[in-house]
Amino acid sequence: MLTKEFHEVISHEGIVSIVSWAKVEPHVVNTWNSYLIIPDDKTILIPAAGMRKTQANTEVNSRVKLTVGSKEAQGKKMGRGFLIEGNAEFLPSGPLYDQMKAKCPFTSRVLVVTVSSIEKTL
């Protein structure tokens, strides 16, 4: 599901936007492409140092939307990007947390996104 083209995009620095929602308006938080870990073709690991509102939202509604992109990854024009949808869970410990903590020592939890769809947007 997470294609070679997706991996090419996240190999360049760019911003990742994470959208979550519960009963009220959507909440958006950002991180960087370089912080992501992709352990398999349907899972994205994201370090969470803050993200308290995102976590509260996912405890009510686990669905999230992410956008990732980089102007350095050439597509038909300058840059490429993707819209990713999936389900999210925050983990404060365990093997996935340990993997993220080794890469991003500032993290207090790992946001695990199980991807259900991916669409090229740029």
Locate each region found by the language model.
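Binding-site signature for planar aromatic cofactors or substrates
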Residues: M1-L122
